[in-house]
């Protein structure tokens, strides 16, 4: 995550940063991570009695997303009808849902291409307001 945040153009809008970040992240996952490993990670998160690492708010993933979304709300790029935390939850749920479905389907479709088609619809709602 930190590597991606370091290469994203700081002059991009938050909308475009999120599109870029998601595209690059999902491409990396699709091309370098074994789908069975991803399935194992997700299943272990459901049954663990300990910390659920995918939900740890101090992860760099959440820090970067919170900063990006907060900045977009403050600048008026995203409508302020939702809090940064609410939009962060929606965005993170979106990514987890796609990753879960991709793993469930054994990676039989392009995760990157599918997300490239769907994510703009989610982000449009951030702009228009929920």
How should these model regions be labeled?
Residues 4-7, 36-45, 102-106:
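Secondary-structure edge/capping motif, primarily at the C-terminal ends of alpha-helices
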Residues 23-66, 77:
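Short secondary-structure transition hinges
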Residues 2-32, 84-91:
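Hydrophobic alpha-helical connector segments
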Residues 20-27, 63, 67-75, 89-93, ...:
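C-terminal peripheral helix-coil segments that are non-catalytic and often amphipathic
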């Amino acid at each position: 995550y930190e590597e991606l945040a370091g290469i994203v153009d700081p002059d991009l809008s938050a909308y475009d940063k999120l599109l870029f970040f998601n595209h690059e992240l999902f491409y990396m996952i699709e091309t370098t991570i074994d789908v069975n490993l991803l399935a194992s990670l997700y299943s272990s998160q459901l049954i663990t009695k300990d910390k659920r690492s995918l939900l740890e708010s101090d992860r760099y993933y959440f820090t970067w997303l919170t900063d990006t979304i907060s900045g977009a709300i403050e600048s008026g790029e995203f409508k302020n009808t939702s809090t940064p935390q609410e939009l962060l939850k929606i965005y993170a749920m979106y990514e987890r849902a796609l990753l879960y479905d991709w793993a469930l389907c054994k990676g039989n479709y392009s995760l990157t291409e599918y997300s490239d088609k769907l994510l703009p619809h989610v982000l449009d709602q951030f702009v228009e307001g929920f």
